[in-house]
């Protein structure tokens, strides 16, 4: 639970919301409709849960105008309750409290630059030429390679690895176990076996980017791998060398993006999507979960390729029939030709 406390009036001012009730009423956490107590703020973002307003014990309710009359307690009336909930969540997140200084167990090279108000946690390693911007926080066990640059107010949770030559903008948040700047999968075949292509590019990440845990973003072969401003990336995502992801795009868990793919701006890629290399995806393109993207997309829109779930016996029959499609196409062509003759 957060140690923060806010009055109805303070929250209304923060959101520029219409306030109804006791201006001095105080809450100290955010909770779901069903479990919220008198010390909690709750919210209604989906009308299908509107009936719960009648029994909710929340001290303050965040909701839209068309639902306001159905809650009799203290309330904040806004146009978009879900967006406002997101904004308030930062206020109640006590884990964001900042620290300053370098932990005694950290190793910081003499040629690295660390802002006075940054924090370097236990057992971190900062190599020569690295730059850590103002207000940036590194959790325990983070590694920052040579000449890597972090902007202001970044947050790296424990055990994040940034190889040499990586650049982060401002307000980049990276969760534990993520590796940025490892070698791309580049090898040239020869009679003697695979010959490694050393990856000479870097990774450039823009401002206000969030990256989940155990995600891997490879460095470029020659040019950089680029993640533009405002991109959000989930856990367990693999982004290969020289990929470019446009501003404002969202990549869900277990997505794999092959080398040199270009994802446009404001795209959404649902879980388990696989994107082929060396293709370009238009801005505002949306892929449903499990889609296998084998070619580029020139027109924005929603795309899907994975078959929906079926009862297993039906799926088996359809799988057999799928294997017979080519045979049936040839039979249909023969019948059509016979009719013409």
Curated annotation (Swiss-Prot):
Superkingdom per UniProt: Bacteria
Subunit architecture: Homotrimer.
Pfam families, per the entry: Hexapep, LpxD
Record GO terms (molecular function): N-acyltransferase activity
Group of enzyme by EC: transferase
GO BP, sorted A to Z: lipid A biosynthetic process
Protein family membership: Belongs to the transferase hexapeptide repeat family. LpxD subfamily.
This enzyme's EC code(s): 2.3.1.191
Matches recorded under PROSITE patterns: HEXAPEP_TRANSFERASES
Phylogenetic placement of the source organism: Bacteria, Pseudomonadati, Pseudomonadota, Gammaproteobacteria, Cellvibrionales
Name of the protein: UDP-3-O-acylglucosamine N-acyltransferase
Residue numbers annotated as active site: 241
Biochemical pathway: Bacterial outer membrane biogenesis; LPS lipid A biosynthesis
Known function: Catalyzes the N-acylation of UDP-3-O-acylglucosamine using 3-hydroxyacyl-ACP as the acyl donor. Is involved in the biosynthesis of lipid A, a phosphorylated glycolipid that anchors the lipopolysaccharide to the outer membrane of the cell.
Gene name for this UniProt entry: lpxD
GO CC annotations, alphabetized: membrane
Catalyzed reactions per annotation: a UDP-3-O-[(3R)-3-hydroxyacyl]-alpha-D-glucosamine + a (3R)-hydroxyacyl-[ACP] = a UDP-2-N,3-O-bis[(3R)-3-hydroxyacyl]-alpha-D-glucosamine + holo-[ACP] + H(+)
Keywords: Acyltransferase, Lipid A biosynthesis, Lipid biosynthesis, Lipid metabolism, Repeat, Transferase
